[in-house]
């Protein structure tokens, strides 16, 4: 925190009693997690004769992985065919088709015949810079780029925080507060002038873009600190250096110019068939130039950063004709959903069940930025989800556990319902005792219903 922010806080201290209800809600959340977890874990472990860890966050997270694996296994790949014509140094594509004979007929009709440009549409588009990092987005990026687990990233950024090289890491905000603007601006100018990635920085820092007091609750976004100017980064462990580098790159990207390009869509006609060609011309690299320099510095494959962008098209005019075009057939197969990685699973955890939560819920999704890494590690250590390179694939035990768990335990809707009631506790609309009584009733009902049902103990998990 900046000195001004600390003084501001002390000048406007509020009585601790103002936060009693917030405290009650936090105690209820922890108590409910413990009560359901300890009873459900013991219950299913006894029923199936093997230790089965069950939890409000862990079980729905495992269910996401199991559902994805089921979707992959049940997916039936189907072939598709796309007729294409090449003319004037560029390629235009027709509609994707499922019948080869139809696509082949179009290819034969068009091959060595003429085509003309029916229309050309040009549109200038802008891609805004990315937001600053909160913990989850930092963990996702580190997994995608470096292959670090969520826990490794948390450990690295925690160490940077303790070395005063990064701000507090356990945050869910991607913005700074107004009192940080002056310090952030001077830090950005130093990074621009002294870091390799600064060569791609254009214009003056736009701090307003990353400043919003209303979107900062407990802690602001994670950024490097001015201590970086007095530190030999080569002496840092490689993991910490990688994470700090990402913080630097993101701060520069978030505050420099937008990326602007002209998108061109050309519609061509060949023998009555419609073909589309798309291209783009960069007008202003903006923040993507900083990102490009960083990508080059870590020798990351350009193919990992394809943005479905076509190369620039030649200048085309409506009515322009191309003689004797070359027609071909592009073949492919539909692809199944991809296995979860920690990057994509963290994203899924952020949004799971969010639509069922109240608009003003403090926590949405499964877990919090500070606990999601620990949840993944528990799933791995419990033998439910081993890591296979970057992929997270549930074991047979994990899949069988989800198969026997009641829907309310493995669904994120339970979290949504709890957060709704906890918000009532926080506002004084529901007593902490009433909330915990409901959780206790739920726990008793779960145990009585399953333990007294026809014995599943002959079944294996």
Task: Kindly give the residue locations of the regions a language model identified.
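Toprim catalytic domain recognition across nucleic-acid enzymes
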Residues: 1-353, 357-384, 389-392, 396-400, ...
């Amino acid at each position: 925190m900046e000195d001004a922010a600390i003084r501001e806080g002390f000048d406007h201290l509020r009585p601790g009693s103002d936060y009693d209800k917030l405290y009650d809600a936090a105690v209820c959340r922890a108590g409910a997690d413990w009560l359901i977890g300890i009873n459900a874990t013991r219950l299913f472990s006894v029923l199936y004769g093997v230790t089965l860890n069950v939890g409000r966050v862990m079980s729905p997270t495992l269910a996401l992985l199991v559902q994805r694996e089921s979707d992959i296994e049940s997916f039936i790949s189907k072939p598709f065919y796309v007729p294409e014509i090449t003319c004037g140094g560029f390629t235009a594509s027709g509609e994707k088709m499922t019948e080869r004979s139809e696509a082949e007929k179009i290819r034969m009709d068009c091959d060595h015949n003429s085509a003309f440009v029916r229309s050309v549409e040009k549109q200038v588009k802008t891609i805004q810079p990315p937001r600053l990092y909160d913990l989850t987005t930092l963990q996702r990026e580190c997994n995608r780029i470096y292959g670090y687990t969520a826990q490794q990233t948390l450990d690295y950024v925690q160490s940077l925080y303790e070395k005063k090289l990064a701000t507090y890491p356990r945050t869910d905000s991607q913005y700074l507060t107004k009192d940080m603007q002056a310090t952030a601006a001077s830090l950005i100018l130093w990074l621009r002038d002294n870091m390799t990635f600064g060569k791609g920085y254009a214009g003056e820092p736009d701090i307003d873009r990353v400043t919003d007091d209303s979107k900062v609750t407990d802690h602001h976004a994670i950024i490097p600190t001015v201590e970086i100017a007095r530190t030999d980064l080569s002496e840092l462990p490689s993991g910490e250096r990688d994470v700090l580098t990402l913080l630097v790159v993101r701060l520069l990207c978030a505050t420099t110019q937008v990326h602007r390009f002209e998108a061109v869509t050309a519609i061509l006609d060949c023998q009555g068939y419609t073909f589309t060609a798309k291209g783009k011309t960069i007008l202003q690299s903006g923040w993507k130039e900083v990102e490009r320099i960083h990508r080059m510095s870590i020798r990351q494959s350009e193919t990992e950063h394809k943005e479905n962008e076509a190369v620039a098209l030649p200048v085309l005019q409506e009515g322009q004709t191309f003689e004797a075009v070359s027609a071909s057939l592009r073949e492919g197969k539909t692809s199944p959903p991809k296995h979860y990685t920690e990057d994509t699973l963290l994203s899924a955890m952020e949004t799971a069940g969010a639509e069922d939560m109240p608009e003003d819920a403090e926590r949405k999704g499964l877990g919090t930025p500070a606990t999601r890494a620990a949840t993944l590690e528990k799933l791995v250590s419990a033998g439910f989800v081993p890591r296979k390179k970057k992929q997270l694939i549930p074991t047979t035990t994990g899949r069988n556990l989800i198969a026997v768990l009641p829907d309310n335990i493995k669904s994120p809707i339970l979290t949504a319902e709890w957060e709704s009631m906890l918000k009532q506790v926080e506002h004084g609309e529901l007593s902490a005792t009433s909330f915990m009584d409901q959780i206790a009733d739920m726990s008793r009902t779960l145990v009585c219903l399953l333990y007294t049902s026809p014995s599943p103990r002959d079944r294996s998990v």
